[in-house]
Amino acid sequence: MPVFREEQRYPRWVYLLAAAAFFGALFAEAVETLSSGGGGPYEWIPGALAGTLGILVINLLFMVTEVTRTELVVTMGRFFPLYRRRVALADILEVRAVTYRPLRDAGGWGIRWGRFEGSRCAFLNARGDRGVFLNLRNGKRLIIGSQNAEALAEAVSREAGLSAQV
């Protein structure tokens, strides 16, 4: 049972861009099929691939962050998770709410690797410039994007028995 749960969606323009790319690819395929005089037995394959890719992309544009009594779980994907990162609370040495620069520090939003405060860091984010910085026992560093970074930092630190730095 989660003690903290946050659902984040990417900004609306990302969905519109994905839809435009999807329908543009389908339209281009239809024009090519019609201009070549109809389809052969395998003409449906590019359309099916575009449809499948479109569903996968739309699915990925959703991020859920949960804190339970024993772990922090970040999941990318709404209908079927395509990426899940689990961090045991016992492995967390430091927790603090931070403001970062997604484009400069991480190269954008999503599942990213970049630099934060001069050291390598993994980023899991969907929107905005606020998140929770985690320093892990194995030396890895992680920033989890959040629209409510202070509440997430408080939940993680409370369950991990640490003091949150907000």
Protein language model features and the residues they cover:
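Transmembrane alpha-helices and immediately adjacent membrane-cytoplasm interface residues
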Residues: 49-64
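A composition-biased, non-transmembrane "mature-region" signal
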Residues: 82, 98, 152-154, 163-166
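N-terminal membrane-targeting/pre-transmembrane regions
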Residues: 1-39, 139-141, 154-155, 166
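Alpha-helical transmembrane signal-anchor/signal-peptide segments
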Residues: 65-72
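Short aromatic/basic micro-patch
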Residues: 66, 86, 143-146
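Non-transmembrane, membrane-adjacent beta-strand/coil modules in membrane-associated proteins
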Residues: 75-140
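Hydrophobic alpha-helical transmembrane segments
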Residues: 38-50
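Terminal membrane-proximal soluble interaction domains of membrane-associated proteins
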Residues: 131-138, 142-157
